[in-house]
């Protein structure tokens, strides 16, 4: 048994929510012997904290953690957790990750941290996929909370895609720039990120069709659209509550 103890009161309210969501999901879906895909981002660091507590106190035994990014791998190693990869464990029991936005149809935008391709690869290797998020990620329609769809692209294709994506899909595109280095963000895979700012208030938008068109475009490695893959979302709210919303279409 792992409980969300410690100096939670010292955390900002939004961080408290992230921690509660991570601990609630871990408590329900991570068991001893689990082969677990571990996502990336600020909410996932609390999942790593949960795993560390369980592993150290013996309530979680023989778990295997497959990270979705270099940073997550470092968190796992620093926490003393067993780390593996898809070469050794190509089939996972569970993947748990955060999201930048989740709409009422369980469609997610991910990739704010630039890890979207590896996140999607690990997610597809898992039998079940659970999202952990604070209340600011809960939306009725994509774009209400997060304005862009991140798209990982080959560097060679970046400039043509900055022009062709808006022509085909509307909106506008920007090449994501780094903060502490000159030039664009470079992903763990050595690629660039284009942020597609899609047009809002478009009724009947078919995200699946958009995903298919983008995925079939030469030079695009992967998009931050996660469609039809979420089994449940754990949203933590400012009043201290955590709500699990189960995707009935997958159960």
From Swiss-Prot:
A GO CC annotation given for this chain: cytoplasm
SUPFAM superfamilies, sorted: D-ribose-5-phosphate isomerase (RpiA), lid domain (SSF75445), NagB/RpiA/CoA transferase-like (SSF100950)
EC number: 5.3.1.6
GO molecular function: ribose-5-phosphate isomerase activity
Pathway: Carbohydrate degradation; pentose phosphate pathway; D-ribose 5-phosphate from D-ribulose 5-phosphate (non-oxidative stage): step 1/1
EC category: isomerase
Pfam families associated with the record: Rib_5-P_isom_A
Keyword annotations of the record: Isomerase
Catalysis performed (reactions): aldehydo-D-ribose 5-phosphate = D-ribulose 5-phosphate
Any Gene Ontology biological process: D-ribose metabolic process
Assigned protein family: Belongs to the ribose 5-phosphate isomerase family.
Protein name: Probable-ribose 5-phosphate isomerase
Native organism: Caenorhabditis elegans
Gene it is expressed from: rpia-1
């Amino acid at each position: 048994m792992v409980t969300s103890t410690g100096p939670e009161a010292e955390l900002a309210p939004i961080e408290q929510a992230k921690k509660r969501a991570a601990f609630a999901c871990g408590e329900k879906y991570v068991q001893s012997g689990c082969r677990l895909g571990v996502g990336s981002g600020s909410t996932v660091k609390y999942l790593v904290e949960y795993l560390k507590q369980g592993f150290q106190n013996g309530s979680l035994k023989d778990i295997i953690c497959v990270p979705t990014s270099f940073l997550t791998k470092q968190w796992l190693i620093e926490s003393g957790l067993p780390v593996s990869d898809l070469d050794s464990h190509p089939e996972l029991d569970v993947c748990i990750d955060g999201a930048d936005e989740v709409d009422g149809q369980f469609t997610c935008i991910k990739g704010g941290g630039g890890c979207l391709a590896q996140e999607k690869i690990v997610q597809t290797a898992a039998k079940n996929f659970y999202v952990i998020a604070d209340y600011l990620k809960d939306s009725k329609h994509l774009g209400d909370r997060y304005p862009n769809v991140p798209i990982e692209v080959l560097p060679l294709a970046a400039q043509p895609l900055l022009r062709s994506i808006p022509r085909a899909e509307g909106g506008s595109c920007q090449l994501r720039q780094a903060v502490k280095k000159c030039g664009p963000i470079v992903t763990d895979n050595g690629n660039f990120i284009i942020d597609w700012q899609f047009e809002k208030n478009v009724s009947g938008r078919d995200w699946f069709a958009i995903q298919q068109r983008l995925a079939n475009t030469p030079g695009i490695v992967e998009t931050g659209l996660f469609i039809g893959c979420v089994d449940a979302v754990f949203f933590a709210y400012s009043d201290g509550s955590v709500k699990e919303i189960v995707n009935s279409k997958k159960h």
